[in-house]
Amino acid sequence: MKAEYLIYQDSNNRTRDEGDATMKAHVLPLALSLVGMILFYLIYTGHRFQPNKSGRHESYRALVFKGLATLCAAALGAYGAWLSPTPPHMLLAAGLVICTAADVILGIDFMIGMAVFGLGHVAYSLSYVLASPPGIPSLIGFLALSAFVLLGVVPWLRKYRAGKPVAPFAAYAMVLAVMLALAIPQKPVLLAGAFLFVASDAMLAGRVIAHVQGKVYSRICLLLYYLAQYLIAASTLAG
């Protein structure tokens, strides 16, 4: 019994040491991605809230920095997919690249940008299905989120977009509902990223549709988005 216990302890110690070594190996790319995102986020917000001669809300220069911040997360996801080239990881990396493009497009044409983001969520959703097939928790989550979209989001859209199309926004909300429901059985870091993405988009809807104003509000919305993308990318390095 003592010998078996010692073998068990030795096995646990080796597993823990291997896990620690793996995390240490990833500290540098994780840190570089995070620092890069913070830096470009700060530069972008500095440009974002400055008036520009074109009359647009965002200058093209500001959009470059906005995209670069997301690109830092995409690079981290690509690194994780390179280390572990599984279909789920490769789809996450693809989704991050798509979202990087969507980030820039959103500032030029909101509707097209929203559609491209939808494609990014499709890539995320496919990754989740391959990584951990949906079960009862995902089904319950989807039904609850769908009910919220139909009974809460759609009436809200009709109120603030009187006389204007609500279908594109409702469809995007359903895509988010599917993505978040499929994230329920995934790694905690991935679920957290999916949740923060939805929270950020909810705040963005408040700003774009209900015209909620304020620099702090906009900065928190964007910060949640970048944190979401960072966590999704970091999940490719999680055990």
Task: Locate each region found by the language model.
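Short, Lys/Arg-enriched N-terminal segments with co-localized hydrophobic residues
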Residues: Q9-T22
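Polytopic alpha-helical membrane-helix bundles and their juxtamembrane interface segments
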Residues: M23-G239
